[in-house]
Amino acid sequence: MKKKGIVLAMVLVMALTLTGCLFRSPEDLYRQPEKSAGYEKLNEAIRKVRTALELNYAAMVEDAGIVAGDNTASIQLQDLDGDGIRESAVTFLRVSGVTNPLKIVVFTQVGEEYEVTGMVEGEGNLVYSIEYRQINDTGRKELIVNWQISSGAYQLGVYTLDDLTLGDDGATRAVRSDSTQIDFSKLMGSELLLTWCSVASDGSNGARLTDIDQDTRTELAVIRVDSSGINSYVEVFGWRNGAMASLGTVNLSKGITELSRVRLNYLAGQPEPPALYITSTLANGGKAIDVVAWLNGKLTDLTLDESGISREILQGYTEVTPTDINGDYVLEIPTPNLLPSYGENLSNDFWLIDWCQYNKNGHRNHVMTTYHNVSDGWYLEIPENWRDQITISRNDQVTGQREVVFSRWLGEDEEPEPFLSIYRISSSQGNRVTENGWFLLREEENVIYAAQFRGSWDCGLNEQQLRDRVKSIQTSWYYD
């Protein structure tokens, strides 16, 4: 009886609690969440800076956008002093009609208030990208800013706030929290570097921060592509003897007219040296891939031949890009090879892709061969004994079904002998797998992949070995 009373009391308490939740007033239900005191203090500090800028320049002040990169928020919380606490807030403003309209303002939390503790400024209408990194080995992190001057024109700047005088509380003497008067001259960071750079057509930045010479210091690699195809190159800058200095340049492949994509990765070997994988567009629409690294004490393009043109050219088939195809964290470079065609397939091109990898000694090594079906989202690792033995065709005549047929090549005058079909069907058509005697490769959301061995040729694979070789194409390979 006592237990029943306890249970009844608990039920009553829960009912009363739920009543309090479910029968709140409409005003309470639709009320915006309360903002933290720190958020309000920061916004008040930003408003004061905007007001001071408007008074100083007699011009309108608005927010400035950040186009690309990992830091695109309008207000960015950062740990600039490297103590593990994000004590700084960075915001981006634009003042209309002045020489350097873009203003990047740094605030530091001092007690419960936010004080403005630094500013950098630049030309253009937008901040293309910004990064924060220790460049000069002391003080606060530097700001590495790519200013978008106009469409297709960019300036890369490196700025330090270390020359600003901070009080014991971490604030400058340029402004007090209760004042709208700001001496901006006391807030300006020092410009360590200002140079032009390219931006890739996929949106990736034409500059990369990395310890490219592996001396434990961060360097800045800047890519510049000449649209005339004559003089494209990479230049590396680093902090030496109290200043930013050019540490070396290296030419990129002749004939490139547009930067397509930049990836920072490694060369094979231990330790893995950093390398830039630079994909550019040629005047004829093909792609050239340059691999740039620090080798034997200097900046080197590992892919250039004696004529100054990259050995890694994608011509005719450009749907693949450098990819970590074998999962060892080092990018491989694709080389497409056109397969022979027969009959109705003469108008359709099918390719096998050889993947190679550059190591820390600059040597090029073959890793694997694949067939990539980009439209259907899968690829097949090709066994070595298939090389020079196969052709590929496609059959999309059945509604809701796509079939890729692998056949043994018997020569130009003989019809190829099919030995394997790989199917992509919708999940709603899953009954076709058993009805047709196929075997399942795998099932994804709304899609089933299946296969069937055909003919008499022993291709050297069983069902499980084929499953292990058919893999999904990761979209990040193409868009990261």
Regions found by a protein language model. Give the residues of each.
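Generic N-terminal leader/processing signal
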Residues: M1-K2, F107
